[in-house]
Amino acid sequence: MGKIIGIDLGTTNSCVAIMDGTTPRVLENAEGDRTTPSIIAYTQDGETLVGQPAKRQAVTNPQNTLFAIKRLIGRRFQDEEVQRDVSIMPFKIIAADNGDAWVEVKGQKMAPPQISAEVLKKMKKTAEDYLGEPVTEAVITVPAYFNDAQRQATKDAGRIAGLEVKRIINEPTAAALAYGLDKGTGNRTIAVYDLGGGTFDISIIEIDEVDGEKTFEVLATNGDTHLGGEDFDSRLINYLVEEFKKDQGIDLRNDPLAMQRLKEAAEKAKIELSSAQQTDVNLPYITADATGPKHMNIKVTRAKLESLVEDLVNRSIEPLKVALQDAGLSVSDIDDVILVGGQTRMPMVQKKVAEFFGKEPRKDVNPDEAVAIGAAVQGGVLTGDVKDVLLLDVTPLSLGIETMGGVMTTLIAKNTTIPTKHSQVFSTAEDNQSAVTIHVLQGERKRAADNKSLGQFNLDGINPAPRGMPQIEVTFDIDADGILHVSAKDKNSGKEQKITIKASSGLNEDEIQKMVRDAEANAEADRKFEELVQTRNQGDHLLHSTRKQVEEAGDKLPADDKTAIESALTALETALKGEDKASIEAKMQELAQVSQKLMEIAQQQHAQQQTAGADASANNAKDDDVVDAEFEEVKDKK
């Protein structure tokens, strides 16, 4: 069995890890970094850049550089959170035909799973380069508070990237695995506070050890899938824009290039303010008007940043209370607090969390790498490389169906351990009703319309009977990935209807297959491009070395040969400017054929140089027989 890699597919950064024996190892990417920016860029010449190369060119290509795509995955265009992003993102967010939030790049509509697949492909390639073998299986993490549609979309992204997603696990649970694996014995209850680039989760997890086997049981989870570092950046960007407008009278929001520069500067300033009390946002030539170029130079103190984002930090505290309440615990029952996600490096966040739990969070967990390490550990559990570890996760939101009067009837309550299965018998609302519609919902509200619709299906062929008589058994089955399968059965006729919830939104099978084929075609195009570049380099080298040999041969090269070589050199030079690998190879072959005489002359010259070198060495050897005498200076006595 091959390796199952662990991938933390983050909003801002992603990370990949593997099990090296029984030890998890975070892998460095091609740029030598342990984390990769979750940024994808589509350049003017049709190239797709991922990670640091994409980030570097963002300033000059803001409309075609996509970031924070995880905030759109599995979401509807009309969602309030998506509408907030539409107004602030430099790229174009659009409504797909099915109402999902998609992105338009260079006139082409793209689904978030398709874009996220580019990041996953880079993670896959990083692992393959390290292992020296193909990788086809992965454990991918998602925020604990992701709903069914978002989990399904993440699995789709894995498939498009050429990965079989063996398990979807929750980020805080993965972090707990990374933390708890090498810690001492005994039972502990931990709180994992995960504030990443775009999402926030809190999970209360109990780690029990019985006879050497560790059980990681999630007691409760809560969160906000639209709260993270990107929101903190936005607050600082808005402040800088307003300050500049006050000072210069120019609104930078109308200038995408300036906004992209400002985004980078704001992120940098936010990071600096975690260790410094103040920083300068200094952006020369940020824009220009009729009077000339304008420069931005604004001082930002840590206190100012904290005042801008205080409500965001406070927003993360309410879910902590709910999670503890759901787990039936109080603050004093928590043994350790673990911080995950880059935004937890902010001192204010650490202070608020410490105040809430009444204890300092642990500092021995790397907030950027813990989730990927935990995913790799789960991969090791699935392959059998990691033994004596049992993971019991929960479903984050209640699941149920719409019943008479537009009410949501819950079948599986939130924080139920998964996998799980639950059945309930319902009946008809009208006399002689021959069909029922099962409308599947996810959420905590009583009114069906206020919850997330996961999809609906019909059960036909019910035998005519008075209302309330037919018995329709509805079964909800949640697998270990947290993905829901629903069936409805008429107990009288035995008729049954089943669906795996693929949200009324989401990608259908044909779309996924098309994207998989596109990704494979792109991989083939990438391979051909790589081969073309290698051939070009060989051609360049041959061009340079042949010209040098012609120069060195001088008059020894017959005029006819020289003319033929010059002609072949020109032909190769022209071919190198094109995109045809076969043409370059043919011109290289022609040059090699007409350069026979030149090669002979070069070999003769080389042989002569070697002979001359040997003679010089022999003379030096003779000189070696001379004994050096030591002289002492004797001064005449005056």
Swiss-Prot record:
The modification Phosphothreonine is found at residue 199. The keyword Phosphoprotein applies. Residues 602-638 are annotated as: Disordered. Residues 602-620 have a biased composition (Low complexity). The modification N6-acetyllysine is found at residues 109, 245, 304, 421, 556. It comes from the Bacteria. One of its GO terms (molecular function) is ATP binding. Keywords: Acetylation, ATP-binding, Chaperone, Nucleotide-binding, Phosphoprotein, Stress response. Acts as a chaperone. This is Chaperone protein DnaK. It comes from Escherichia coli O9:H4 (strain HS).
